[in-house]
Amino acid sequence: LAAVRRRLLRTRPDVVFNRVESLGGSDAMMAAIPLLLETMQIPYTGCSSEALAATASKLGVKEQVVRAGLPTPPWLTSDGRVHTSGQMPHRRSGSAGGEKFILKSVFEHSSFQLGDESIIEAADLAAVKRALRRCETKTGRPFFAEQFVGKREFNLSILGSQPEVLPPAEIDFSALPPGKPHIVGREAKCDASTFEFHHTPRRFDFSPADQLLINRLKELAVECSRLFDLRGYARIDFRCDAHGQPWILEVNSNPCVSPNAGFMAAMERAGYEFDDALARLLDDALSPGISSAVRTGKSRSRRAEPRKAQNAAAVK
């Protein structure tokens, strides 16, 4: 952090494009750089350090979502505690009853250690706890088990603090062979040499029969944006059950904004060229309500009109 601070003092950027997704080998620390920028009164793209910290833990997100009365699948931690939103049936304590669970890292993103083997069908909760402990022993990171919901997965990208909900995307699993889990694992997300990467595309076109579901997804995305005070850019991930009910999986307050990432795909679908999309994100970072009141707590008299910012630095 000291080296980053020295570089920022030397370059004196008008705005920083924040691309920090992890620090010290863990995504749990991704709020550190935005917090540093706030102390230096330097505007930056994306969500505030407070929002990043609040969403760093997937369990913390789920707990806040439950308190807000929003739907999220039940989950189990390795200490044996069962958590539920009260909106989805779950088995009595001690019995998983053949339910399917997905094993997830608490803090790491980008489908960390997520593959077909992450979907388990357990006879009881003790078996789920054993599976979690194996994951934690292997990786040295905390994991949790979430009830596996349905076969449809949606990503809704959020732009700006208003917020603007970009066109919803659904992951198309139709090309996967029978029996293969309908998930976006590490290979599907990050390894272009794999079958999964090339056979889990996004789609943005929906039938009229899906319109009520799409509207509900947008409503939930806005509610999540307000709940976590999201700004700049963010993404909300959902699964949909057999009854058409959407469930909030994760709130990603720092999604990847590379050209081939889901957020930029949604921006393109909304009519933004890549350069225009970047300019839009910078504009949001330099808007008075963000760069002054939220980022620094006071006005920045040297800030010109957003489009005229000449000195932008990228931190990644």
Q: Language-model segments: what does each one mean?
A:
Residues 66-69, 177, 207-316:
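ATP-dependent carboxylate activation and anion-phosphoryl transfer catalytic cores
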Residues 123-219, 242-247:
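Phosphate-binding site of ATP-dependent enzymes
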Residues 15, 43-44, 72, 101, ...:
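Hydrophobic beta-strand scaffold residues
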Residues 21-23, 106-108, 254:
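Short glycine-rich anion-binding loops that position phosphate/pyrophosphate groups of nucleotides
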Residues 105, 160, 170, 252-255:
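Short beta-strand elements
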Residues 1-45, 50, 54-56, 82-89, ...:
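ATP-binding N-terminal substructure of ATP-dependent carboxylate-amine bond-forming enzymes
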Residues 8-12, 52-144, 149-152, 162:
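Active-site nucleotide/adenylate-binding loops and adjacent lid/helix of ATP-dependent enzymes
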